[in-house]
C-alpha cells in the first residue's frame, strides 16, 4: 500500500492505470469518495476508465486507510493532558478541522505532492461537495468534473438536529464484531441501494464504516449537513466555471434526485443526468449505464 504525507497527515493512495505505448502521458482523473467510505468503491469505475485516464484514488483524511491526525498533533494532544503549557496547547490546536473546505485544500496539497498540475475530478456524495468546493477554489487545476449524488438542500432546524443526534449515535456505536455477524453488510447498505451490488462491495462498505476515525466521521456529519452548508452550496454551484456533469440516482434516499436537479439548474456549465432504477451508488448499481453517460459527457466536452 502506498502512503503520502499531505499537510502533515499520512494519506493512502493508489494508481489504477494501464501502461501506454504512446509517449504522451494520459490525463489524470482523481476519484473522491463519500462519508465513511474509501477509495475501494471507486476501483471498478476507475478500472473501466483506465484506457483513457491515469486514475488516482485516495482515502480522505480520517477515512479508510488514511490517518485522522498527524503524528505531531497526536503527540501534542497527549502532552496537553500532562501539561498546562500554553505552547503545547497551541501546538495541539493546530490540528486540521473537518470543514469540507479543508478537505478541498487537502486535495490540492495531494496534487502538489504528486506534481499533478491539472486533473479531471470524479467525486461522490460528501466527496462531491468537497469536489465542488475544489472546482471553485482551484478552477485552473481542473479539466472537467463529474459529481455523483450531489445537490442542494434547505435548512430545517428540527430535521438537522434529529439527523445529527442519530448520526452521532451511529458513529459512537461501531463495535468491530459487527463485521462478523452474517447479513449485517446487507442490512447496513440496504438504505443506500435500489439494486443489489456484489457481496465484496457490501463487505468493504461495512469495513470502511468501522474503520473511520471517530473525530473525522463525527466532525463531517456536522459540517456537511448544516445551516452553513445549506446556505453555501447553492452559491458554490452558481460559481462553477468548469464543465461539470451531475449524476443522480432515481431512488436515492440520501441525496434525492430532485436536489441534484435543483443544483444543476443553477448553472449552465452543469449538465444533469439521472440514472433510472438506482439509488445512492449508481456507478455500482448500474455500471454500464453510468459509464455510458460519463463517457458521453467526456466525449462531448472534449469535442
Task: Kindly give the residue locations of the regions a language model identified.
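Flexible "cap/lid" loop of the alpha/beta hydrolase fold
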Residues: 136, 143-176
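Active-site glycine-rich loops that stabilize anionic/oxyanionic intermediates
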Residues: 26, 34-37, 125
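Serine-hydrolase catalytic-loop signature spanning alpha/beta hydrolases and amidase-signature enzymes
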Residues: 34-44, 55
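Active-site loop/oxyanion-hole signature of alpha/beta-hydrolase fold enzymes
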Residues: 9, 21, 44-47, 57-126, ...
Amino acid at each position: 500500500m502506498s502512503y503520502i504525507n499531505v499537510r502533515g497527515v499520512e494519506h493512502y493512495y493508489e494508481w489504477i492505470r494501464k501502461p501506454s505505448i504512446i509517449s504522451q502521458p494520459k490525463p489524470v482523473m482523481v476519484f473522491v469518495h463519500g462519508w465513511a467510505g474509501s477509495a475501494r468503491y471507486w476501483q471498478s469505475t476507475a478500472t473501466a476508465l483506465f484506457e483513457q485516464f491515469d486514475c488516482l484514488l485516495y482515502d480522505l483524511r480520517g477515512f479508510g486507510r488514511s490517518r485522522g491526525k498527524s503524528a505531531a498533533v497526536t503527540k501534542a494532544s497527549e502532552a496537553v493532558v500532562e501539561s498546562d503549557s500554553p505552547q503545547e496547547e497551541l501546538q495541539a490546536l493546530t490540528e486540521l478541522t473537518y470543514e469540507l473546505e479543508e478537505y478541498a485544500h487537502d486535495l490540492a496539497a495531494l496534487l502538489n505532492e504528486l506534481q499533478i498540475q491539472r486533473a479531471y475530478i470524479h467525486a461522490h456524495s460528501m466527496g462531491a461537495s468537497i469536489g465542488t468546493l475544489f472546482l471553485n477554489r482551484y478552477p485552473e487545476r481542473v479539466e472537467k468534473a463529474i459529481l455523483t449524488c450531489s445537490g442542494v438542500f434547505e435548512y430545517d432546524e428540527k430535521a438537522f438536529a434529529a439527523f445529527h443526534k442519530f448520526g452521532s449515535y451511529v458513529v459512537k456505536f461501531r463495535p468491530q464484531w459487527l463485521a462478523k455477524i452474517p447479513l449485517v453488510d446487507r442490512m447496513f447498505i440496504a438504505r443506500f441501494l435500489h439494486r443489489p451490488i456484489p457481496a465484496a462491495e457490501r463487505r468493504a462498505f461495512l469495513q470502511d464504516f468501522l474503520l473511520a476515525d471517530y473525530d473525522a466521521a463525527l466532525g463531517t456529519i456536522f459540517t456537511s449537513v448544516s445551516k452553513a452548508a445549506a446556505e453555501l452550496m447553492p452559491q458554490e454551484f452558481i460559481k462553477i466555471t468548469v464543465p461539470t456533469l451531475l449524476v443522480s440516482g432515481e431512488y436515492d434516499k440520501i441525496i434525492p434526485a430532485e436536489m441534484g436537479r435543483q443544483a444543476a439548474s443553477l448553472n449552465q456549465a452543469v449538465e444533469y443526468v439521472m440514472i433510472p432504477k438506482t439509488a445512492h451508488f449508481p456507478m455500482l448499481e448500474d455500471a454500464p449505464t453510468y459509464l455510458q453517460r460519463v463517457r458521453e459527457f467526456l466525449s462531448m466536452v472534449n469535442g
